Amino acid sequence: MQYQLLINGVLVDGEGERQSVYNPATGEVILEIAEASPAQIDAAVQAAVNTFAEWGQTTPKARAECLLKLADSIEQNALEFARLESQNCGKPLHCVINDEIPAIVDVFRFFAGAARCLSGLAAGEYLEGHTSMIRRDPIGVVASIAPWNYPLMMAAWKLAPALAAGNCVVIKPSEITPLTALKLAALAKDIFPPGVLNVLFGRGQTVGDVLTGHEKVRMVSLTGSIATGEHILRHTAPAIKRTHMELGGKAPVIVFDDADLDAVAQGVRTFGFYNAGQDCTAACRIYAQRGIYDALVEKLGNAVSSLKMGAPEDESTELGPLSSLAHLKRVTAAVEEAKALSHIRVITGGSQTEGKGYYFAPTLLADAKQEDAIVQREVFGPVVSITVFDDEDQVLRWGNDSRYGLASSVWTQDVGRAHRLSARLQYGCTWINTHFMLVSEMPHGGQKQSGYGKDMSLYGLEDYTLVRHIMVKH
């Protein structure tokens, strides 16, 4: 198993404190890995700085070829990546193989093509006797912090656009789920020039803070919690670094009385509980119009209770464990707080399961009120609440009454209503009669405290560039 760091093109052991990496399905230690030391962090950043002078001037074609080679290598090692991700995260193995690995490969291939298609305003004489042109140049050294819910996927979302744009990257995966990023480092070592991509390991307080605060780091990209985002923004503010933040969500799922309730129930069963609900776009905050509320509660209860929990390697498993014991405790506390409210009905689930591993039963909580914490706060687990509403104006207010602004969905057969709501919902994405659908060509990113900046799409590529104006007098 690959456990070494990648610094300046060389795989090396960490020199810092050793940290245990767990299998959440069993609670057992997989292995221990030594963190990067401050000297190693500095060496990784300095390697990126030194290489940037050359890598930043390479042609888009050359960078694209490297990304395509990495995509091919991931595809060729798909089963090994999937097994590592499943073991380290508790994800059902078949979900990683069939859903995540193909999407990861596609992200690298998309940005390989996008690198060769950056656009800008037409050059011209906007001032007589002077010709102006626009350049999109790489920023420099990017520090990327990836989360624990989709370790390899989020690494791909960060690495592909940054490298395609000509930046050099130092990435730190979560200390909870580092195995696939470290495996990726071993493949990248033989594809990219030394220093272009560096992979570290360690906790936020010991490695992340040193990395993001390094004076030579020009940009910080984070996918994580609001608290982590706020910490990094405060930490990097004195240096005025470029930042790119995706900080979670609490997606409203608005169901009108003309919606296809079977489709809604099946959709929430899939989109609310994929990856054990550990997804910032999860369909977790349901609003149902009064006329269909009881019927939808019944259908959702039947759908959610039919989800099969089990071992990640079992092909029939739909729901795996949560990622860590600490997170299991957070989810349990959130549900217990909701259950203590007299108006909340537990339709199914509501507690962790017996036995080994960090499993929490798929949970549906009915009759939640707008002000309830279960409606307002991100639980990030297999927990869905449902709230009754009366009319379009009310549900629009409630849908937008959130500090989050990442994703939302509207379920209705009324095209006009769908357009009205999608235009007014304060979310980076609104799906109509579906949820959770992501493609490399379209942007993913939020508003409000869900952060700013886009992943995927040409907009994501542009986020890792500097717009510059060149004027020539003649």
UniProtKB/Swiss-Prot annotation:
<keyword id="KW-0560">Oxidoreductase</keyword>
<protein>
    <recommendedName>
        <fullName>Gamma-aminobutyraldehyde dehydrogenase</fullName>
        <ecNumber>1.2.1.19</ecNumber>
        <ecNumber>1.2.1.-</ecNumber>
    </recommendedName>
</protein>
<dbReference type="InterPro" id="IPR029510">
    <property type="entry name" value="Ald_DH_CS_GLU"/>
</dbReference>
<comment type="subunit">
    <text>Homotetramer.</text>
</comment>
<feature type="active site">
    <location>
        <position position="246"/>
    </location>
</feature>
<comment type="function">
    <text>Catalyzes the oxidation 4-aminobutanal (gamma-aminobutyraldehyde) to 4-aminobutanoate (gamma-aminobutyrate or GABA). This is the second step in one of two pathways for putrescine degradation, where putrescine is converted into 4-aminobutanoate via 4-aminobutanal. Also functions as a 5-aminopentanal dehydrogenase in a a L-lysine degradation pathway to succinate that proceeds via cadaverine, glutarate and L-2-hydroxyglutarate.</text>
</comment>
<dbReference type="InterPro" id="IPR016162">
    <property type="entry name" value="Ald_DH_N"/>
</dbReference>
<dbReference type="GO" id="GO:0019477">
    <property type="term" value="P:L-lysine catabolic process"/>
</dbReference>
<feature type="binding site">
    <location>
        <begin position="225"/>
        <end position="228"/>
    </location>
    <ligand>
        <name>NAD(+)</name>
    </ligand>
</feature>
<comment type="similarity">
    <text>Belongs to the aldehyde dehydrogenase family. Gamma-aminobutyraldehyde dehydrogenase subfamily.</text>
</comment>
<feature type="binding site">
    <location>
        <begin position="146"/>
        <end position="148"/>
    </location>
    <ligand>
        <name>NAD(+)</name>
    </ligand>
</feature>
<dbReference type="InterPro" id="IPR016161">
    <property type="entry name" value="Ald_DH/histidinol_DH"/>
</dbReference>
<comment type="pathway">
    <text>Amino-acid degradation.</text>
</comment>
<dbReference type="InterPro" id="IPR016163">
    <property type="entry name" value="Ald_DH_C"/>
</dbReference>
<dbReference type="InterPro" id="IPR015657">
    <property type="entry name" value="Aminobutyraldehyde_DH"/>
</dbReference>
<feature type="binding site">
    <location>
        <position position="280"/>
    </location>
    <ligand>
        <name>NAD(+)</name>
    </ligand>
</feature>
<comment type="pathway">
    <text>Amine and polyamine degradation; putrescine degradation; 4-aminobutanoate from 4-aminobutanal: step 1/1.</text>
</comment>
<dbReference type="InterPro" id="IPR017749">
    <property type="entry name" value="PatD"/>
</dbReference>
<feature type="binding site">
    <location>
        <position position="209"/>
    </location>
    <ligand>
        <name>NAD(+)</name>
    </ligand>
</feature>
<dbReference type="GO" id="GO:0019145">
    <property type="term" value="F:aminobutyraldehyde dehydrogenase (NAD+) activity"/>
</dbReference>
<feature type="active site" description="Nucleophile">
    <location>
        <position position="280"/>
    </location>
</feature>
<dbReference type="GO" id="GO:0051287">
    <property type="term" value="F:NAD binding"/>
</dbReference>
<keyword id="KW-0520">NAD</keyword>
<dbReference type="InterPro" id="IPR015590">
    <property type="entry name" value="Aldehyde_DH_dom"/>
</dbReference>
<dbReference type="Pfam" id="PF00171">
    <property type="entry name" value="Aldedh"/>
</dbReference>
<feature type="binding site">
    <location>
        <begin position="172"/>
        <end position="175"/>
    </location>
    <ligand>
        <name>NAD(+)</name>
    </ligand>
</feature>
<dbReference type="GO" id="GO:0009447">
    <property type="term" value="P:putrescine catabolic process"/>
</dbReference>
